[in-house]
Amino acid sequence: VTDSLDDAGVEAVTAARVLDPARVLVAVDHDTPAGTVAVAEKQRKLLDFARDQGLPFRYGQGIGYHLALEGGLKPGSVAVCCGRHAAVLGAGGVLGLSLPPKELKTALETGTVSLPEAEVCRLRLAGALDRYVTAWDLALHLAPRCRGTLAVLGGGGLDFCQRAAVCGLLAASGAVTALFTEEPLDGAETVELAAVEPMAVLPGNFERIVPASRVDGLRVNQVFIGGCAGGTLEALRQTAAIWRGRRVNPYVRVLVAPATAAVYAQALEEGLVEVFMEAGALVMNQGCSACWAQSQGRCDGGEV
């Protein structure tokens, strides 16, 4: 349960009498610290809900999905929430489902959930991505064939950061959810990773996926490295390796936000944060940060 809920959602979910408090996590991770009085009131209601029923509660410690995985959520588990990025849990082999608030209330009270009826799209990844092709490109490459399905993927040797990017973007582009498995994928379609090219999404929605060559030369106003897929330790290490000894363009706002406090601490220990700051980036607190973009990191209507 997170502060991504709107006011009506908070009222619905906090009315639940929780069946098993140990299996629930309440995480204030989106607007931290609160940017308005209304947001502060919503977060207080979540705190009261957690305290009154003895629920685990985390404030400002990072993105709830990552906190759940750090807390020992095991492959093969089912996790439900109201957040739109629940599929990121699939990077750890967890079936993450996003529910409407009233259905989440029922799940909290009964410990059960009705699984969605969806075609299963099984994909076996083979080979390796080219040097300048990323997991984000892979997700956009797969998006058209995964829309409306439960995507189950295996192979490819992707690390956690890459799997999180694939699962999160597949769900954002229309899949019901997505997850990686170590189990055999009988009848799976094979996807050759070497055939994937750099991709981009044009403003508007994920229906507008194009080869990155279509936007070559596009002027960018703001860059955000963070969120469910970009705030992992692996992503921060990759960024620091590219930036070390370089400076960002002074006319481009560059924001970096680690996914969790544990990731932030490790990034500090490895000197990654120092690299970001010396490059001229703004290092944010852990959490959803500018991916949520409600109280920090917003662009104006004409910016990219």
Residue ranges with predicted function:
Residues V1-V304:
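Fe-S-dependent hydro-lyases/dehydratases of central metabolism
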